[in-house]
């Protein structure tokens, strides 16, 4: 069998490299029906690839976060979404984690990955990071943004409200950082 392994500075670039590789393989296989494939000499490849008109097509990215995978909890809320758009503009591959159904709100999620998750359950958070690692190969930036405020005086605050507040505003952040940092340590990158 045959296979192709592609890499790139970002997930999008790696997918583009994969598409180019698969297309090239397809052309070579189709051409082999009519004869044998022989590449042009390496000197000619260099001349063709570094021809000034070819080089003019290459853009040098000024995006500071190109190739970085940013994971944001509470990504569909105001602060989370604004952060996601900024990170995306700077070139990051953005993963939004939220319990909100994006179909119920009107946000442009084009180019972003959305994962529905109740982050108050540690096992859910672990599964989300497993999924992100499978898709993107790792994590570079963690934004632990999810949270809510209970508007109630302490004397009227029920045990259930208190527990819910701590589950999301404290324990969920711990689970998120714990599992995210574990991936960063395994990658041997410092992360953000």
Regions found by a protein language model. Name each.
Residues 153-154, 158-163:
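Substrate-binding pocket helix/loop in short-chain dehydrogenase/reductase
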Residues 76-77:
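Conserved glycine-rich cofactor-binding loop
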Residues 117-127, 159:
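The beta1-alpha1 cofactor-binding region of Rossmann-like NAD(H)/NADP(H)-dependent oxidoreductases
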Residues 138-139, 184-192:
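Active-site loop of short-chain dehydrogenase/reductase
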Residues 92-105:
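Conserved glycine-rich Rossmann-like NAD(P)H-binding loop of the short-chain dehydrogenase/reductase
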Residues 177-178:
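A short, exposed helix-loop element centered on a Lys and neighboring polar residues
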Residues 145-150:
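Conserved NAD(P)H cofactor-binding loop of Rossmann-fold oxidoreductase domains
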